[in-house]
């Protein structure tokens, strides 16, 4: 690398490595091939290209890699490649996931003369796909000059990190080989959260302390943006200091320590388990940290606590009852609040927590030993270990996992807001890759996916095998799209799938030389498997086919489906 100048592509990849990205995801295409050659020029053997089976799966993988590592990058090609990935980036945008989408586009000469090239719409508009992506990105940039490239790249990466949303970078096929100033690379990018206005922050702390002092039964609700904006420790410190009963939303699962003595369950508005609901809704002051109040995350907007008894902590504002304090970030506010409270006084008013984890219930209305959701999920929870990373699929798995209380340090990856079926398979690959690239590479990666969703994105198991990764894949075989059946069309043909797949040979079919597959029909078979030390080591890729009744479903899914069906008819 020159001490003064560096190739634009080399600059870009060096910056990505400095941010902690070690695997560049994507699919090669003629407009990005020359750029991909520059990955090796970074000069770090841990930094590498890791291809995907298709662009949509790649976007899903980038989403989950970012959840594990903090940020990710994926390279696609102009038009046909980038459009295939857009669904995945829409999910990352809505769920607040920082992904850098790099698109190889026609060279700068073609951009100026606009010939009738392949992968275009045939109308000479070479920016149309960039405009599409601009609606799903926090920012977009087009590199057509070496002079400005470094600045544009750095600004784009800062936006990606600060907003925790995808960004889009168009790189003409010749622009990766333009030269740009190398000197900024001497200073790694660091994006600390700006300090709050001290005067306003002091006012906010005082007002919150006053409301806590006046309350008789305060509680805390932890949501998705605690994880998205990396304030897990600040949130846990606040919980430990106050002893307030603490609930999580579906999107807030594993954002805090669920083995904490102050953890009191999952709150989903009207869909909450009745005993938890009664306790949660008896509060006279609800402190919501990192809220993201979507329909499936809130029981279709059925929170019972009024705004007059609510304080909301967000990444860029704080809301106290009806008053909004712009620019007061929870990242800095929570530690100030924790330091300011009178622990003895505050802890004295904290209601004792008497949380009991869900218990496995044997099958009702089915043959003895049949695996049902009431039994499976609490039983699955007993299999988990500290620091496991569990990816759950949209639909059955996302709702069933709510009955699992996670050990300390676990991470549950889900896509509750966007809800694209098939997401979890690509996400599993990205998560497992992220674990490998992390400071804790020995964590287990576990996927739970239904057979219907698996059929959409199964190809990414091939990439998982090709890269020597060893996740445990649970396939719930219940012969179709259960969540759709419950919403509409219980016995409709459009909710059926091909039920003749041979899951037991799936891993071998994708070329796995070392793998294990299990065909589980009964409670005893699954319990025996969970006791198997070899299985628990997760030293080879494994697939567990779990057979469940067609119309059996988790309680929360059944109730949510009723709400959704009713809403769809309005």
Swiss-Prot record:
Its main location: cytoplasm. InterPro entries: DHS-like_NAD/FAD-binding_dom, PDC/IPDC-like, THDP-binding, Thiamin_PyroP_enz_cen_dom, Thiamin_PyroP_enz_TPP-bd_dom, TPP_enzyme_TPP-bd, TPP_PDC_IPDC, TPP_PYR_PDC_IPDC-like. It is an enzyme of class 4 (lyase). Coiled coil: none annotated. Its EC number is 4.1.1.1. Gene3D superfamilies: 3.40.50.970, TPP-binding domain. The keyword Lyase applies. Keywords: Cytoplasm, Decarboxylase, Lyase, Magnesium, Metal-binding, Nucleus, Pyruvate, Thiamine pyrophosphate. Homotetramer. Belongs to the TPP enzyme family. This is Putative pyruvate decarboxylase C3G9.11c. The lineage of its organism: Eukaryota, Fungi, Dikarya, Ascomycota, Taphrinomycotina.
């Amino acid at each position: 690398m020159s001490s003064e100048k560096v190739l634009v592509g080399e600059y870009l990849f060096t910056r990505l490595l400095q941010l902690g990205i070690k695997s560049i995801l994507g699919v090669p295409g003629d407009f990005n091939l020359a750029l991909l050659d520059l990955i090796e020029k970074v000069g770090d053997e841990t930094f590498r290209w890791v291809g995907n089976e298709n662009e949509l799966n790649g976007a899903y993988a980038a989403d989950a890699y970012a959840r594990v590592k903090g940020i990710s990058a994926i390279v696609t090609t102009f038009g046909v490649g980038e459009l295939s990935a857009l669904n995945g980036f829409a999910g990352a945008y809505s769920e607040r996931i920082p992904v850098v989408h790099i698109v190889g586009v026609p060279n700068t000469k073609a951009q100026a003369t606009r010939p009738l090239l392949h992968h275009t719409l045939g109308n000479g508009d070479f920016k149309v796909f960039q405009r599409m992506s601009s609606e799903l990105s926090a920012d977009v940039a087009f590199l057509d000059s070496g002079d400005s490239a470094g600045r544009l790249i750095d600004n784009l990466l800062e936006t990606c990190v600060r907003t925790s949303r995808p960004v889009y970078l168009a790189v003409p096929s010749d622009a990766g080989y333009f030269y740009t100033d190398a000197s900024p690379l001497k200073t790694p990018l660091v994006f600390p959260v700006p300090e709050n206005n001290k005067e306003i922050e002091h006012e906010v702390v005082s007002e919150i302390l006053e409301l806590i002092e006046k309350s008789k039964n305060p509680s805390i609700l932890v949501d998705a943006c605690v994880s998205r904006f990396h304030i897990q420790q600040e949130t846990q410190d606040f919980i430990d200091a106050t002893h307030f009963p603490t609930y999580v939303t579906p999107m807030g699962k594993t954002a805090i320590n669920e083995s904490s003595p102050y953890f009191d369950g999952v709150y989903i508005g009207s869909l909450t388990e009745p005993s938890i609901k009664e306790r949660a809704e008896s509060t006279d002051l609800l402190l919501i940290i990192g809220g993201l109040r979507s329909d499936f995350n809130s029981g279709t907007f059925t929170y019972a606590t009024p705004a007059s008894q609510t304080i909301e902590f967000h990444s860029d504002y704080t809301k106290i009852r009806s008053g909004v304090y712009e620019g007061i970030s929870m990242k800095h506010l929570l530690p100030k609040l924790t330091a300011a409270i009178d622990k003895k006084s505050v802890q004295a008013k904290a209601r004792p927590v008497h949380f009991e984890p869900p218990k496995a219930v044997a099958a009702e209305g089915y043959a003895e030993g049949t695996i049902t959701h009431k039994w499976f999920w609490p039983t699955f929870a007993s299999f988990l270990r500290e620091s496991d990373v569990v990816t759950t699929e949209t639909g059955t798995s996302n709702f069933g996992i709510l009955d699992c209380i996670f050990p300390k340090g676990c991470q549950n990856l889900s896509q509750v807001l966007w809800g694209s079926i098939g997401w979890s398979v690509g996400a599993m690959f990205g998560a497992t890759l992220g674990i490998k690239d992390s400071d804790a590479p020995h964590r287990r990666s576990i996927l739970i996916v239904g057979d219907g969703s698996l059929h959409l994105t199964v190809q990414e198991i091939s990439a998982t095998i090709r890269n020597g990764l060893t996740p445990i894949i649970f396939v719930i075989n219940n012969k179709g799209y259960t969540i759709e059946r419950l919403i509409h069309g219980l016995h409709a043909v459009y909710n059926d799938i091909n039920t003749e797949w041979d899951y037991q040979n799936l891993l071998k079919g994708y070329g796995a030389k070392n793998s294990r597959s299990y065909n589980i029909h009964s409670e005893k078979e699954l319990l025996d498997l969970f006791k198997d030390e070899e299985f628990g080591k997760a030293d080879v890729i494994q697939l567990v086919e779990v057979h469940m009744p067609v119309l059996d479903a988790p309680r929360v899914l059944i109730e949510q489906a009723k709400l959704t069906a009713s809403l769809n008819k309005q």
